């Protein structure tokens, strides 16, 4: 089970789909990495030669993935909160950030509904 960017890739999947287990690499980026590394698309992770593995690892190192990407995203959110932007306030209050309506839904962000005592007559 090869380790690339600190992630164990699944042995039985093709290399492009195995790379998507790395945070920050989607299927399109994975196909680009495989093509740039010169590895055939139909090779399974278990069948990679050490040379091919090194080429793929070198291509993945060009991208910001896993811990570095998670850190950047959290720092971006923290920066939005510190400058007092609207998006930062929404993050701080745990509400939807991208303009969704919240009158009826948004339960994922707002959490479980709390009933108000004495509301019904």
UniProtKB/Swiss-Prot annotation:
SUPFAM superfamilies: S13-like H2TH domain (SSF46946)
GO cellular component, one term: cytosol
Annotated Pfam families: Ribosomal_S13
Keyword Acetylation found: no
UniProt record, GO biological process: translation
Region spans: Disordered: 89-121
GO MF, one annotated term: tRNA binding
Gene3D superfamilies (alphabetical): 1.10.8.50, 30s ribosomal protein s13, domain 2
Keyword Ribonucleoprotein: yes
Key words of the record: Ribonucleoprotein, Ribosomal protein, RNA-binding, rRNA-binding, tRNA-binding
Disulfide bond sites: none
Xref: PANTHER family: 30S RIBOSOMAL PROTEIN S13/40S RIBOSOMAL PROTEIN S18, SMALL RIBOSOMAL SUBUNIT PROTEIN US13M
Role summary: Located at the top of the head of the 30S subunit, it contacts several helices of the 16S rRNA. In the 70S ribosome it contacts the 23S rRNA (bridge B1a) and protein L5 of the 50S subunit (bridge B1b), connecting the 2 subunits; these bridges are implicated in subunit movement. Contacts the tRNAs in the A and P-sites.
Entry-linked HAMAP family: Ribosomal_uS13
Subunit-structure text: Part of the 30S ribosomal subunit. Forms a loose heterodimer with protein S19. Forms two bridges to the 50S subunit in the 70S ribosome.
Entry similarity comment: Belongs to the universal ribosomal protein uS13 family.
Stated name of the protein: Small ribosomal subunit protein uS13
Lineage: Bacteria, Bacillati, Bacillota, Bacilli, Lactobacillales
